[in-house]
């Protein structure tokens, strides 16, 4: 996760350092906020021990239920129907998810520029995935070329877009295919219901998910976004959206999808929290970069 030096209000949504496998959280009775027990073990009868065990179990049930309920979405999201978004890919470092991305052809992935820190960092792309715990429907592809927008810099919020050329063309099937891009200079209308998806965290400091999650979000007026973000928002290059659900850390690079078209690339959110009510999430506007995208693909082919 990177916090640009130019502002104190922004989080880019990539996982910049390779995350270790998240350890299962263990409940320590003595430090649990709702439980405090002091006793001398030799004074406990079997009956008392049983009663205490039952009381502990009863006190934990609400927390266990809550965990099971919230551990199913990015931010207020729901689990996507398996392979209903066959364009989605996972960008990984040392086989750990750090960012999202999406296929725009059988050879190219579009993602956020801040997801890659430059050589010698090596990323791989996992296609056809839904649940990372089940690998039978997915496979890993090496990246041949990293092509960040020429005007993107690490500390900049602008031009946060990158093409990845895959080392080999993906095999297209029901679980793997690309998504359409908008036409040049085609802007999505405000108040359009769109969606985001990813394998990112469930909240700012929460755990990530093994399953692809999705959430609805609605585009908002540029004037409103400019008022919220100030000079950090550039209407010619960015789109703002907000809703009950939204992107979080690890969702960077995934698409903002309106209809069946990818119109934006997940870029940054308010530092106060993922899907903050104070500031809408910001996406790189794909239509503004179509000439660059098409030129790169033409030159390579």
Regions found by a protein language model. Name each.
Residues 162-168:
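Conserved beta strand-loop-helix elements of the APE1-like EEP
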Residues 88-92, 192-301:
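Extracellular trypsin-like serine protease catalytic domains
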Residues 84-86, 120, 159-161, 174, ...:
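Extracytoplasmic
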Residues 68-73, 91, 109-112, 116-154, ...:
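Conserved H-D interstitial segment of serine endopeptidase catalytic domains
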Residues 147-153, 169-212:
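Active-site substrate-binding loop(s) of clan PA
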Residues 2-4, 8-27, 37-110, 123-129, ...:
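Protease-domain processing segments flanking chymotrypsin-fold serine proteases, especially trypsin-like
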Residues 77-81, 152-154, 205-207, 280:
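Conserved, non-catalytic sequence blocks in retroelement Pol enzymes and Pol-derived host proteins
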Residues 4-6, 18-24, 28-31, 187, ...:
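C-terminal helix/juxtamembrane-tail motif
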